[in-house]
Amino acid sequence: MKKYLFFLGLLFIVSCKKADTPYAGFSMYFEKPQPINDSELSKIPNKFRGIFMNSDSMYINIKENIILQEKYYKHRFHKNELDSIKTAFDLVGNQYVSKLNKDVFDYRYLGDSIEFSNKQIDTFFVFLDTQKAKRIDGQLVLNYKDSIYWKIKAISVEKNMLKIKYIYSEEDLKRIDSLTKVKSTMIDSALFLLKPSRNEFKRILNLKKLGETREYKKVKNN
């Protein structure tokens, strides 16, 4: 029963998970896609393509026209608990479908146990009018339009290690303002607008220990 309750708790966590939304409450936006005056890319450069995995077995799958975030969930329990598990699922063909969120789980028997597995795939980036990619100083800059302004993520690849930089804190803002001629503008108490020049943006990306950097090791070419 404990495993059953744990599994349902895990299912709830999976159902509540958002695609790459690690921070909330403080936001920095750019007036225009970064870096300004640089041409937009029409595809992801070869250097950045591949499948990368972090220490939590989260995958970043970078293809020519799209970047996906993938997570695999597995849970094993005794087959005697299957009747209890079934109350939260519908059996459709050879898969169990969650009544909570319609997630689909494959299953297999392993001796006296049964294993449920599920793959969550979220779109990290795709070329749209509201999502644009540019490149500067060897880094890939992903721009995401939110209403009329833009948020960014910066990606670099060095020695088969993918690094994704998130800029999100008040301390980050102070360091950015120290580099720019035009200081940030407060839109509301937790939202600031940035207008760096191209060279200033390049310097921002190269600041040491700016924001948080997540690392993924390359496990496969695309």
What are these regions (language model features)?
Residues 17-45, 66, 70-78, 83, ...:
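Calycin-type beta-barrel ligand-binding domains and close structural analogs
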Residues 1-4:
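Positively charged n-region of N-terminal signal peptides that target proteins for export
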Residues 47-59:
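Tryptophan-anchored aromatic micro-motifs
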Residues 61-65:
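Short beta-strand-centered aromatic/proline hotspots
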Residues 12-15:
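C-terminal motif of bacterial Sec signal peptides marking the signal peptidase cleavage site
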